[in-house]
Amino acid sequence: MSDSEKLNLDSIIGRLLEVQGSRPGKNVQLTENEIRGLCLKSREIFLSQPILLELEAPLKICGDIHGQYYDLLRLFEYGGFPPESNYLFLGDYVDRGKQSLETICLLLAYKIRYPENFFLLRGNHECASINRIYGFYDECKRRYNIKLWKTFTDCFNCLPIAAIVDEKIFCCHGGLSPDLQSMEQIRRIMRPTDVPDQGLLCDLLWSDPDKDVQGWGENDRGVSFTFGAEVVAKFLHKHDLDLICRAHQVVEDGYEFFAKRQLVTLFSAPNYCGEFDNAGAMMSVDETLMCSFQILKPADKNKGKYGQFSGLNPGGRPITPPRNSAKAKK
């Protein structure tokens, strides 16, 4: 019997959730075999599902988490722990924060437990060459061993890349690509795959919108491109979509609109790295595709954990206009 068949998921999830309400930073040490089992079983499920997911509302969409495990628990407290709500995460689960292992293990455990209600996309940090440098490798090496980090790499190489919600909301981690002409191109990407230095897969995980760019521009990250509002409008029109939902950039209010509200950036790690005073946000999409935003305020700046206000209805006017906020690049 393989590790994945022996997984006691309820026990694993129970232990991961036990630290709720504890001082942030308290670790949960699963066994190496349990973690390996989570990686192997979730990898199997990722490969059994499409690389371009076709999802149905209602669901909640979350942006970058970056190892901020206690903030992930706050998101679930606020949005409802699975299976109470359906979730789509847009990538960047690991690196930078202190508890990448707890974060990714809980997400993988929920994926295995609720495979049709819980979805994870790949971010640019779910890539060996990136998380080797920005913290995840060191955390794996310190708490377990390098072999386990390699097992995570094999799992990450099988994550789906994009999702379309009810044929109207296109979701990915980074953004658009000059190479993307048809959705079939995404469907044709074979897994497992590393993230290449350029091309369609790279762009979907790395590109950024830029209000000062017309068409396509150079990206300050040194990878991929930036794209302007007209690129967004043309893409939506061509594919009969209403909205692009992406993550990948710190935004002050946890969410930020672009291109006349045709694109929204979500970032779900409040007080990112302890260096930014940003809120985190989660976007709730109801059955009518009305989108509203649930806000996690920066924890230490506010007595109340949460704030909530509603946002856009794709193709319509928002209830609450977005506040202007400065973007910070990760």
From Swiss-Prot:
GO terms for molecular function: cadherin binding involved in cell-cell adhesion; iron ion binding; phosphatase activity; phosphoprotein phosphatase activity; protein phosphatase 1 binding; protein serine/threonine phosphatase activity; ribonucleoprotein complex binding; RNA polymerase II CTD heptapeptide repeat S5 phosphatase activity. The modification Phosphotyrosine is found at residue 306. Residues 306-330 are annotated as: Disordered. The modification N-acetylserine is found at residue 2. Pfam families: Metallophos, STPPase_N. SUPFAM superfamilies: Metallo-dependent phosphatases. It catalyses: O-phospho-L-seryl-[protein] + H2O = L-seryl-[protein] + phosphate; O-phospho-L-threonyl-[protein] + H2O = L-threonyl-[protein] + phosphate. It comes from the Eukaryota. Keywords: Acetylation, Biological rhythms, Carbohydrate metabolism, Cell cycle, Cell division, Cytoplasm, Glycogen metabolism, Hydrolase, Manganese, Metal-binding, Nucleus, Phosphoprotein, Protein phosphatase. Its EC number is 3.1.3.16. The modification Phosphoserine is found at residues 2, 22, 325. Its cofactor is Fe cation; Mn(2+). GO terms for biological process: branching morphogenesis of an epithelial tube; cell division; circadian regulation of gene expression; entrainment of circadian clock by photoperiod; glycogen metabolic process; lung development; negative regulation of transcription elongation by RNA polymerase II; positive regulation of extrinsic apoptotic signaling pathway in absence of ligand. Its main location: cytoplasm. InterPro entries: Calcineurin-like_PHP_ApaH, Metallo-depent_PP-like, PP1_catalytic_subunit, Ser/Thr-sp_prot-phosphatase, STPPase_N. One of its GO terms (cellular component) is presynapse. Mn(2+) 2 binds at residues 64, 92, 124, 173, 248. Phosphorylated. Dephosphorylated at Thr-320 in the presence of ionizing radiation. It is found in: Cytoplasm; Nucleus; Nucleus, Nucleoplasm; Nucleus, Nucleolus. Binds 1 Fe cation per subunit. Binds 2 manganese ions per subunit. The active site is at residue 125. Belongs to the PPP phosphatase family. PP-1 subfamily. Protein phosphatase that associates with over 200 regulatory proteins to form highly specific holoenzymes which dephosphorylate hundreds of biological targets. Protein phosphatase 1 (PP1) is essential for cell division, transcription elongation, and participates in the regulation of glycogen metabolism, muscle contractility and protein synthesis. Involved in regulation of ionic conductances and long-term synaptic plasticity. May play an important role in dephosphorylating substrates such as the postsynaptic density-associated Ca(2+)/calmodulin dependent protein kinase II. PP1 comprises a catalytic subunit, PPP1CA, PPP1CB or PPP1CC, which is folded into its native form by inhibitor 2 and glycogen synthetase kinase 3, and then complexed to one or several targeting or regulatory subunits. PPP1R12A, PPP1R12B and PPP1R12C mediate binding to myosin. PPP1R3A (in skeletal muscle), PPP1R3B (in liver), PPP1R3C, PPP1R3D and PPP1R3F (in brain) mediate binding to glycogen. Interacts with PPP1R9A, PPP1R9B and PPP1R7. Interacts with PPP1R15A; the interaction mediates binding to EIF2S1. Interacts with YLPM1. Forms a complex with ILF2, ILF3, YLPM1, KHDRBS1, RBMX and NCOA5. This is Serine/threonine-protein phosphatase PP1-alpha catalytic subunit.
